[in-house]
Amino acid sequence: GLKGAEITFPFISVGATEHALLTAVLADGETVLNNAACEPEIIDLADCLNAMGAKVIGAGTSRISIIGVSSLRGVDYSVVPDRIEAGTYALAAATVGGRVKLSNICKDHLGALWPLIEQAGAKLTFNKTSVLIERNSTKLKAVDIDTQAYPGFPTDLQAQFMTMMCLAEGTSIIRENIFENRFMHCPELSRMGADIDVRGRE
């Protein structure tokens, strides 16, 4: 069977952390994951696994320890709201303007996004689990972004933010620091009239 091991990821990866976590919970002995991803989804996965009988410690930090167990049990579990989905709708609302309320969100999971939407010209009003996005006659302003591992700006919202910046006054610089070839949407935006110049990762 599988045996616990110490694993150091060469770079931060959500998918790699999740796969190692899922495998380690049923391995014999202790597994330690170094340079692990810290995203909310990692914490949520660990919480779910622990509810099922796993022994996961340190999720949400760069070092996760897992003590293998012989079996897991079924549970009822509600997953965390999807922050990328929330961010996509928020950016869509800010882009087209008007007044849109998003419910069942985790504000803290998108801490890097909200200030940038406000800098771009939208007004945000938060309640406990909702946000109201408003932009009427205010013109969008150019904002620069750098994608980063959590809690930085999510690479999965880079294309949506770029789309909003296509309608902004001024020049925006968008740097993609997570994935190569993550500007595949640029030619399509250019076909629709956007003025985009891609140079390497920006």
Residue ranges and their predicted role:
Residues 1-202:
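Structural preference for solvent-exposed beta-strand-turn elements
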